[in-house]
C-alpha cells in the first residue's frame, strides 16, 4: 500500500478528534465542503461553536420554553422522521393531533362540535396561527361584503400594540393595519380608540392577550362590549380574533374568571403558542375556530386519512410530528391540575422579583406578574424625573456579563421615549434561580454606582425582545 495512503488511513483510524487534520482548519462557511470528515470531528466543531450561544435558561427575554424533561426528548427523537402533514402514512400521529385540537378547544370554551371534532389545527408557532386566523377573518368579511354588493378592495384590521407577525399578515395579504398606538398613560387598545378606528371595511379586531412589550393583558371583554354597542348604533358586525400567544395557556388555569375566549360571541378564532406557556418544545402553535362556520371552506384542503379524507389548513407543509406529540405528552402528564401548579409557580417567582426589585431603585411598574393582570412577567421603568445614576440599558449590559439576558428597550407608537426593562418568568426559572438573579442585579447596581463615568455607554448595544 502507498505510504501516504497508509499514513492517511492510520490517522483517520487512530487520531483523536483534536488531533485530526479536519479540526486543524477553519470550518467552511462560504462554500459547500469538498471533502468528508469523521462524524465525531464534525460534531465537535459544531458543538464547540454552540458554546458561544447564550445560556437558554438565563434568557429572561424569551417567552418560549427553555426546559423540557427527558421524556420530551425521547418522544421528539422517536418522531424526528415522521412528517406531520402525511396523515395517511402516520395515522396515529394524526389522531394525537386531533386530540390536542379537541383539548385546546375545550380549554377555551369552544361550543361543542356537531361531529365531535373541534375546528382547529396545529401550526409551527403562534405566528402561523395568527396568519391563519387573519386569513379566515378576511375571507368571512369578503363574503359578507360581496353578499351586500359592496367593494372588497380596502380591508383593514384593528389592533393594539401587536407582535410583528400581524404586520407581516397585513403586508402579505394586502390589509391595512390600524394599530392603536401606545402613548403615555394609554399603553393598550381601549374601547374608545378602537371604535374610532372601525368601519365597514374592518375585517376584525385583534386584542393581544399578553402584550409582548410589557406582559399585560389587553382584556377582550370591554372591547367586545363596545363592538356590541357599535353594531347597535351602525349595523356593522365585527368579529374578533384573540392573539393569546402567551395568555391562552395561562388564564384558563390561574385566572379562570377572566372572560376572554369563546365565551364572548364575537370571538371567532383564537391563536396561541404551544411552545410558550403551553410548555411544548419549540415549533408548536395552535389556532382554534369557534365552529365550522367560522372557517371558510375555500381555505381547507382535504387529504387522505384512514380510508377517508380529513381537512387541513396550514401555510407550512412538511415538518416533524414531534412537537405535536410532545404537546400531547404535556397535556396528559400535567392535566389541568399540573398546569395550574406549574403556572402558579411562575407567577410566584414574578411576584417575588417585583417586590424585591421595587426596593432597589426608583421604579414604576407596568406589570408585576399578577394572574389577574397579565402573564408572569415583570416590567418596569424609571420613575419620571428620577436619575439613579444609570440607565436601564446600563443595567441590562451589566447583567449580560453574568449571562443574564434581560432586555431593556423603548416602547412603541407614541411612547418611544419610555424605556422599560422586562423579565419573563417561565417553567425552569425557579425561586432559587430568581434569587441568584437578584444577587447579580444588586452587584450590577453597586458596580454602576462605583463607576459613574461608564453610564450610558450600553445604550447602543442593548437589545429588545418583543
From Swiss-Prot:
User: Which of UniProt's keywords are assigned here?
Assistant: Decarboxylase, Lyase, Pyridoxal phosphate
Q: Which cofactor does it need?
A: pyridoxal 5'-phosphate
Residues binding substrate: 62, 83
| Annotated GO MF terms | glutamate decarboxylase activity; pyridoxal phosphate binding
Check the record and name the Gene3D superfamilies matching this protein: 3.90.1150.160, 4.10.280.50, Type I PLP-dependent aspartate aminotransferase-like (Major domain)
Known catalytic reactions: L-glutamate + H(+) = 4-aminobutanoate + CO2
**Domain of life of the organism in this record?**
Bacteria
| One Gene Ontology CC term in the entry | cytosol
Q: Does the keyword Lyase apply?
A: yes
Q: Give the induction annotation.
A: By acidic conditions. Expression is regulated by a complex system involving RpoS, cAMP, CRP, EvgAS, H-NS, GadE, GadW and GadX. The level of involvement for each regulator varies depending upon the growth phase and the medium.
Q: Indicate which residues the UniProt annotation says bind pyridoxal 5'-phosphate.
A: 126-127, 212, 275
Name the enzyme group at the top EC level: lyase
Biological process per Gene Ontology, one example term = glutamate catabolic process
Q: Lyase among the record's keywords?
A: yes
The Enzyme Commission number assigned here is 4.1.1.15
Question: N6-(pyridoxal phosphate)lysine is carried by which residues?
Answer: 276
Q: Which family does it belong to?
A: Belongs to the group II decarboxylase family.
Oligomer and partners: Homohexamer.
Please describe what this protein does.
Converts glutamate to gamma-aminobutyrate (GABA), consuming one intracellular proton in the reaction. The gad system helps to maintain a near-neutral intracellular pH when cells are exposed to extremely acidic conditions. The ability to survive transit through the acidic conditions of the stomach is essential for successful colonization of the mammalian host by commensal and pathogenic bacteria.
List the protein's name.
Glutamate decarboxylase alpha
Organism equals Escherichia coli (strain K12)
Amino acid at each position: 500500500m502507498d505510504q501516504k495512503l497508509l499514513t492517511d488511513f492510520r490517522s483517520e483510524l487512530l487520531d483523536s478528534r483534536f488531533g485530526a487534520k479536519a479540526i486543524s482548519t477553519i470550518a467552511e462557511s462560504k462554500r459547500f465542503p469538498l471533502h468528508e470528515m469523521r462524524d465525531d470531528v464534525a460534531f465537535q466543531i459544531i458543538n464547540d461553536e454552540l458554546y458561544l450561544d447564550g445560556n437558554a435558561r438565563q434568557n429572561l427575554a424569551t417567552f418560549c420554553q427553555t426546559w423540557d424533561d427527558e421524556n420530551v426528548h425521547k418522544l421528539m427523537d422517536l418522531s424526528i422522521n415522521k412528517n406531520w402533514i402525511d396523515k395517511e402514512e402516520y395515522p396515529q400521529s394524526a389522531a394525537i393531533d386531533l386530540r390536542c385540537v379537541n383539548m385546546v378547544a375545550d380549554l377555551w370554551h369552544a361550543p361543542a362540535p356537531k361531529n365531535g371534532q373541534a375546528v382547529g389545527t396545529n401550526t409551527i408557532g403562534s405566528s402561523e396561527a395568527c396568519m391563519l386566523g387573519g386569513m379566515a377573518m378576511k375571507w368571512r368579511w369578503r363574503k359578507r361584503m360581496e353578499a351586500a354588493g359592496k367593494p372588497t378592495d380596502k380591508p383593514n384590521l384593528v389592533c393594539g400594540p401587536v407582535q410583528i407577525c400581524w404586520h407581516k399578515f397585513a403586508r402579505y395579504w394586502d390589509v391595512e393595519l390600524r394599530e392603536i398606538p401606545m402613548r403615555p398613560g394609554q399603553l393598550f387598545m381601549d374601547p374608545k380608540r378602537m371604535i374610532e378606528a372601525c368601519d365597514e371595511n374592518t375585517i376584525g379586531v385583534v386584542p393581544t392577550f399578553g402584550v409582548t412589550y410589557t406582559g399585560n393583558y389587553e382584556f377582550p371583554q370591554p372591547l367586545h362590549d363596545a363592538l356590541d354597542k357599535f353594531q347597535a348604533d351602525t349595523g356593522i358586525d365585527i368579529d374578533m380574533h384573540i392573539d393569546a400567544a402567551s395568555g391562552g395557556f395561562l388564564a384558563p388555569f390561574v385566572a379562570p374568571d377572566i372572560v376572554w375566549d369563546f365565551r364572548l360571541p364575537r370571538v371567532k378564532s383564537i391563536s396561541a403558542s404551544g411552545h410558550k406557556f403551553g410548555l411544548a418544545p419549540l415549533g408548536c402553535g395552535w389556532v382554534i375556530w369557534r365552529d365550522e362556520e367560522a372557517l371558510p371552506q375555500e381555505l381547507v384542503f382535504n387529504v387522505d386519512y384512514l380510508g377517508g379524507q380529513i381537512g387541513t389548513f396550514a401555510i407550512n407543509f412538511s415538518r416533524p410530528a414531534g412537537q405535536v406529540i410532545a404537546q400531547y405528552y404535556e397535556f396528559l402528564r400535567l392535566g389541568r391540575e399540573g398546569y395550574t401548579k406549574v403556572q402558579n409557580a411562575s407567577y410566584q417567582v414574578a411576584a417575588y422579583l417585583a417586590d424585591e426589585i421595587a426596593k432597589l431603585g426608583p421604579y414604576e411598574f407596568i406589570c408585576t406578574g399578577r394572574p389577574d393582570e397579565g402573564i408572569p412577567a415583570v416590567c418596569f421603568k424609571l420613575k419620571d424625573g428620577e436619575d439613579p445614576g444609570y440607565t436601564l440599558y446600563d443595567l441590562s449590559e451589566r447583567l449580560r456579563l453574568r449571562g443574564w439576558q434581560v432586555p431593556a428597550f423603548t416602547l412603541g407608537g407614541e411612547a418611544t421615549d419610555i424605556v422599560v426593562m422586562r423579565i419573563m418568568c417561565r417553567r425552569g426559572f425557579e425561586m432559587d434561580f430568581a434569587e441568584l438573579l437578584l444577587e447579580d442585579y444588586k452587584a450590577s447596581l453597586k458596580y454602576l454606582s462605583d463607576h459613574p463615568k461608564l453610564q450610558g455607554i450600553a445604550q447602543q448595544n442593548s437589545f429588545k425582545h418583543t
